[in-house]
Amino acid sequence: MTLKDIVVGFGTTVRSIWLIGMNAFAKRETLMYPEEPVYLPPRYRGRIVLTRDPDGQERCVACNLCAVACPVGCISLQKAETADGRWYPEFFRINFSRCIFCGLCEEACPTTAIQLTPDFELGEFKRQDLVYEKENLLISGPGKYPEYNFYRMAGMAIDGKDKGDAENEAKPIDVKGLLP
Protein backbone atom coordinates (compact mmCIF):
# COMPACT_ATOMS: atom_id res chain seq x y z
CA MET A 1 0.00 0.00 0.00
CA THR A 2 1.51 3.29 -1.11
CA LEU A 3 1.10 6.79 0.21
CA LYS A 4 -0.98 7.61 -2.87
CA ASP A 5 -3.49 4.85 -2.03
CA ILE A 6 -3.80 6.12 1.56
CA VAL A 7 -4.45 9.70 0.39
CA VAL A 8 -7.03 8.58 -2.20
CA GLY A 9 -8.80 6.38 0.40
CA PHE A 10 -8.82 9.20 2.96
CA GLY A 11 -10.08 11.67 0.33
CA THR A 12 -12.98 9.46 -0.74
CA THR A 13 -13.97 8.90 2.89
CA VAL A 14 -13.95 12.65 3.62
CA ARG A 15 -15.91 13.32 0.40
CA SER A 16 -18.53 10.70 1.37
CA ILE A 17 -18.92 12.18 4.86
CA TRP A 18 -19.22 15.67 3.33
CA LEU A 19 -21.98 14.58 0.88
CA ILE A 20 -23.90 12.81 3.65
CA GLY A 21 -23.66 15.91 5.82
CA MET A 22 -24.92 18.14 2.99
CA ASN A 23 -27.93 15.94 2.20
CA ALA A 24 -28.84 14.89 5.75
CA PHE A 25 -31.07 17.92 6.30
CA ALA A 26 -32.36 18.35 2.73
CA LYS A 27 -36.00 17.76 1.81
CA ARG A 28 -36.74 14.05 1.50
CA GLU A 29 -37.89 12.67 -1.83
CA THR A 30 -39.40 9.50 -0.42
CA LEU A 31 -43.11 9.66 0.44
CA MET A 32 -44.39 7.75 3.42
CA TYR A 33 -47.16 6.24 1.32
CA PRO A 34 -50.04 5.28 3.54
CA GLU A 35 -49.80 8.48 5.58
CA GLU A 36 -49.09 10.83 2.66
CA PRO A 37 -51.31 10.67 -0.45
CA VAL A 38 -49.65 9.89 -3.76
CA TYR A 39 -50.04 12.39 -6.61
CA LEU A 40 -51.94 10.82 -9.50
CA PRO A 41 -52.07 12.54 -12.90
CA PRO A 42 -55.55 13.52 -14.15
CA ARG A 43 -55.64 10.74 -16.77
CA TYR A 44 -54.29 8.01 -14.52
CA ARG A 45 -55.60 4.56 -15.47
CA GLY A 46 -56.37 2.41 -12.46
CA ARG A 47 -58.96 -0.20 -11.49
CA ILE A 48 -61.77 -0.98 -13.94
CA VAL A 49 -65.43 -0.51 -12.98
CA LEU A 50 -68.73 -1.18 -14.74
CA THR A 51 -71.20 1.71 -14.69
CA ARG A 52 -74.97 2.01 -14.92
CA ASP A 53 -77.36 4.07 -17.05
CA PRO A 54 -79.07 7.13 -15.57
CA ASP A 55 -82.09 4.80 -15.26
CA GLY A 56 -80.09 2.47 -13.00
CA GLN A 57 -79.72 -0.44 -15.44
CA GLU A 58 -76.39 -1.94 -16.50
CA ARG A 59 -74.73 -0.17 -19.41
CA CYS A 60 -72.85 -3.22 -20.63
CA VAL A 61 -74.51 -4.84 -23.67
CA ALA A 62 -72.07 -7.79 -23.79
CA CYS A 63 -70.78 -6.87 -27.25
CA ASN A 64 -67.42 -8.52 -26.41
CA LEU A 65 -65.39 -5.63 -27.90
CA CYS A 66 -63.53 -5.10 -24.64
CA ALA A 67 -62.40 -8.73 -24.53
CA VAL A 68 -61.23 -8.55 -28.15
CA ALA A 69 -59.35 -5.28 -27.58
CA CYS A 70 -57.59 -6.53 -24.45
CA PRO A 71 -53.97 -7.35 -25.40
CA VAL A 72 -53.49 -9.83 -22.53
CA GLY A 73 -56.93 -11.46 -22.61
CA CYS A 74 -57.87 -10.80 -19.01
CA ILE A 75 -61.57 -10.02 -19.73
CA SER A 76 -64.16 -12.74 -20.27
CA LEU A 77 -67.93 -12.41 -20.52
CA GLN A 78 -71.02 -14.23 -21.75
CA LYS A 79 -73.96 -12.54 -23.46
CA ALA A 80 -77.58 -13.08 -22.39
CA GLU A 81 -80.82 -11.41 -23.48
CA THR A 82 -83.83 -10.13 -21.54
CA ALA A 83 -87.45 -10.59 -22.63
CA ASP A 84 -87.54 -7.11 -24.19
CA GLY A 85 -84.46 -7.82 -26.34
CA ARG A 86 -81.89 -5.99 -24.25
CA TRP A 87 -78.48 -7.66 -24.05
CA TYR A 88 -76.60 -7.93 -20.80
CA PRO A 89 -73.58 -9.90 -19.59
CA GLU A 90 -74.55 -13.12 -17.84
CA PHE A 91 -71.11 -13.02 -16.26
CA PHE A 92 -68.32 -10.46 -16.61
CA ARG A 93 -64.92 -11.41 -15.25
CA ILE A 94 -61.63 -9.47 -15.13
CA ASN A 95 -58.38 -11.01 -13.93
CA PHE A 96 -56.48 -8.07 -12.43
CA SER A 97 -53.36 -10.18 -11.92
CA ARG A 98 -52.98 -10.17 -15.73
CA CYS A 99 -54.38 -6.69 -16.49
CA ILE A 100 -51.80 -4.12 -17.63
CA PHE A 101 -54.22 -1.16 -17.22
CA CYS A 102 -53.70 0.00 -20.80
CA GLY A 103 -57.23 1.42 -21.17
CA LEU A 104 -57.97 -0.25 -24.53
CA CYS A 105 -61.11 -1.86 -23.10
CA GLU A 106 -62.44 1.55 -22.09
CA GLU A 107 -61.79 2.95 -25.57
CA ALA A 108 -63.42 -0.05 -27.27
CA CYS A 109 -66.61 0.07 -25.18
CA PRO A 110 -69.43 1.64 -27.26
CA THR A 111 -71.69 2.17 -24.24
CA THR A 112 -69.10 3.71 -21.87
CA ALA A 113 -69.87 0.87 -19.46
CA ILE A 114 -66.19 0.21 -18.73
CA GLN A 115 -64.38 3.07 -17.05
CA LEU A 116 -61.02 3.27 -15.34
CA THR A 117 -60.81 4.81 -11.88
CA PRO A 118 -57.77 6.23 -10.06
CA ASP A 119 -57.85 3.34 -7.57
CA PHE A 120 -54.54 1.48 -7.68
CA GLU A 121 -54.43 -0.45 -4.42
CA LEU A 122 -55.00 -4.01 -5.58
CA GLY A 123 -52.68 -5.89 -3.25
CA GLU A 124 -53.93 -9.35 -2.28
CA PHE A 125 -52.38 -12.44 -0.71
CA LYS A 126 -54.07 -14.90 -3.09
CA ARG A 127 -54.24 -14.61 -6.87
CA GLN A 128 -57.83 -15.84 -6.85
CA ASP A 129 -58.80 -12.66 -4.99
CA LEU A 130 -57.66 -10.59 -8.00
CA VAL A 131 -60.31 -12.15 -10.25
CA TYR A 132 -63.27 -9.76 -10.06
CA GLU A 133 -66.79 -10.77 -11.03
CA LYS A 134 -69.55 -8.49 -12.31
CA GLU A 135 -70.91 -7.97 -8.80
CA ASN A 136 -67.52 -6.64 -7.65
CA LEU A 137 -67.13 -4.35 -10.67
CA LEU A 138 -70.60 -2.77 -10.86
CA ILE A 139 -70.96 0.64 -9.24
CA SER A 140 -74.24 2.35 -8.49
CA GLY A 141 -73.62 5.52 -10.51
CA PRO A 142 -73.08 6.47 -14.15
CA GLY A 143 -69.39 7.35 -13.73
CA LYS A 144 -67.78 9.95 -16.01
CA TYR A 145 -70.74 10.27 -18.40
CA PRO A 146 -73.86 10.83 -16.29
CA GLU A 147 -76.31 11.67 -19.11
CA TYR A 148 -75.34 9.00 -21.66
CA ASN A 149 -77.82 6.19 -22.25
CA PHE A 150 -76.87 3.77 -25.04
CA TYR A 151 -80.35 2.48 -25.77
CA ARG A 152 -81.78 5.98 -26.14
CA MET A 153 -78.95 7.07 -28.43
CA ALA A 154 -78.77 3.86 -30.48
CA GLY A 155 -82.42 3.89 -31.49
CA MET A 156 -83.35 0.48 -30.13
CA ALA A 157 -86.98 0.28 -29.17
CA ILE A 158 -87.48 1.17 -25.53
CA ASP A 159 -90.40 -0.20 -23.55
CA GLY A 160 -93.36 2.11 -24.10
CA LYS A 161 -91.77 3.98 -27.04
CA ASP A 162 -91.75 3.27 -30.75
CA LYS A 163 -88.68 3.60 -32.93
CA GLY A 164 -88.05 7.27 -33.59
CA ASP A 165 -89.50 8.51 -30.29
CA ALA A 166 -86.21 8.59 -28.37
CA GLU A 167 -84.06 11.71 -28.09
CA ASN A 168 -81.80 12.57 -31.08
CA GLU A 169 -83.53 9.90 -33.17
CA ALA A 170 -85.20 10.44 -36.54
CA LYS A 171 -88.38 8.63 -37.51
CA PRO A 172 -87.72 5.44 -39.53
CA ILE A 173 -87.99 5.74 -43.31
CA ASP A 174 -90.14 3.27 -45.21
CA VAL A 175 -87.63 2.18 -47.85
CA LYS A 176 -90.09 -0.03 -49.70
CA GLY A 177 -92.42 2.94 -50.14
CA LEU A 178 -89.69 4.78 -52.07
CA LEU A 179 -89.45 2.11 -54.78
CA PRO A 180 -91.05 2.93 -58.19
Curated annotation (Swiss-Prot):
Taxonomy, superkingdom: Bacteria
Keyword line: 4Fe-4S, Cell inner membrane, Cell membrane, Iron, Iron-sulfur, Membrane, Metal-binding, NAD, Quinone, Repeat, Translocase, Ubiquinone
InterPro entries: 4Fe4S_Fe-S-bd (IPR017896), 4Fe4S_Fe_S_CS (IPR017900), NADH_quinone_OxRdtase_chainI (IPR010226)
Domain 4Fe-4S ferredoxin-type: 48-80, 90-119
Subcellular location, record wording: Cell inner membrane
SUPFAM superfamilies noted in UniProt: 4Fe-4S ferredoxins
GO biological process: aerobic respiration
Binding of [4Fe-4S] cluster 1, residues: 60, 63, 66, 109
EC number: 7.1.1.-
Enzyme class, spelled out: translocase
Binding site for [4Fe-4S] cluster 2: 70, 99, 102, 105
Pfam families: Fer4_7
Cofactors, names only: [4Fe-4S] cluster
Function: NDH-1 shuttles electrons from NADH, via FMN and iron-sulfur (Fe-S) centers, to quinones in the respiratory chain. The immediate electron acceptor for the enzyme in this species is believed to be ubiquinone. Couples the redox reaction to proton translocation (for every two electrons transferred, four hydrogen ions are translocated across the cytoplasmic membrane), and thus conserves the redox energy in a proton gradient.
Cellular compartments per GO CC: plasma membrane
Encoding gene, per UniProt annotation: nuoI
Protein name as it appears in the record: NADH-quinone oxidoreductase subunit I
Cofactor annotation remark: Binds 2 [4Fe-4S] clusters per subunit.
Family affiliation: Belongs to the complex I 23 kDa subunit family.
Mode of membrane association: Peripheral membrane protein
Complex and partners: NDH-1 is composed of 13 different subunits. Subunits NuoA, H, J, K, L, M, N constitute the membrane sector of the complex.
Catalytic reaction(s) noted: a quinone + NADH + 5 H(+)(in) = a quinol + NAD(+) + 4 H(+)(out)
